[in-house]
Structures are given as C-alpha cells and as structure tokens.
C-alpha cells in the first residue's frame, strides 16, 4: 500500500521520457508498474475529470508490453550476472559498491536490453568502476 501511495502520482503530466520510464519500471518491477498504471487510471476516473482512456496509463502499459517483449530485466535477479560475478570481474570485496553497480546495470539494461549478456555486463561493470575511479581522482 505504501508503494502505491508513494508512486501513483509519478509522471502525472505524462512528460517523462521513455528512457526515464524504462529505468523506473525496471526498478519497480513489471507487476508493480502495471499496478501503478491501473491505480493511476482508477484515480483519474474517480476524480470525474476524464471518463475515457487515461493517456499516461495507456502509454505506460504499451511501454511495459514493449519492454517485456524485448526481454528487459525487471529485477536485479533477472540480470545475467550475480553480485559474485561483479566481485570476481572487478576484484571487489562484498560491499555496497557491488549493489550500486548491479543497480546501474539494471538501469542500463532497461534501456538497452540486448546488453543483458555476461560479456557485455562485464564490460559495462568494468567501465563503471573505471569511471568512478577517475571521478574520485578528480577530487
């Protein structure tokens, strides 16, 4: 219930870019994203302002269907790598950094689902670590 209350007003004006929606939906998961679309539609209809199709809910459903057809991972578990893989690839100990990298990989694959392969995820993870290291050296 808290999740629904917190997110049912997300992108109320239907102005979020598809890339932004993809990343958000991957973070929320497929079922929860559909549920929020349903709640959005019910909320708008309940207000009496619109009786027909609710543009944002319809757009979300279409995008979610497309994402599902493309094989977008809707959870960190659906990525074709594990935290252990990331630790091995990057010679990292178990730490919050591993989870941060995995979350970034999920966001990336929400937009570029074809990159959800072990080889591509390894390269992306290495690039992320290298970029973070460069950023730390600038401080």
Q: Positions of the model-derived regions?
A:
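Histidine/acidic-rich helix-loop-helix segments that form or flank divalent-metal centers
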Residues: 1-54, 72
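Charged substrate- and nucleic-acid-binding regions of tRNA-handling and nucleotidyl-transfer enzymes
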Residues: 47-139
């Amino acid at each position: 219930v808290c999740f629904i209350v917190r997110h049912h007003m997300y992108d109320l004006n239907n102005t979020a870019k598809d890339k932004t929606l993809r990343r958000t939906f991957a973070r929320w998961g497929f079922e929860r994203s559909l549920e929020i679309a349903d709640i959005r539609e019910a909320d708008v209809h309940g207000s009496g302002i619109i009786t027909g199709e609710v543009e944002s809910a319809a757009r979300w459903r279409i995008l979610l269907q497309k994402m599902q057809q493309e094989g977008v991972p809707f959870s960190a578990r659906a990525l074709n790598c594990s935290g252990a893989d990331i630790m091995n690839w990057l010679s990292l100990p178990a730490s919050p950094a591993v989870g941060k990298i995995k979350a970034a990989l999920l966001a990336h694959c929400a937009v570029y689902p074809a990159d959800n392969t072990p080889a591509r995820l390894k390269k992306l993870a290495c690039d992320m670590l290298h970029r973070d290291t460069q950023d730390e050296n600038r401080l």
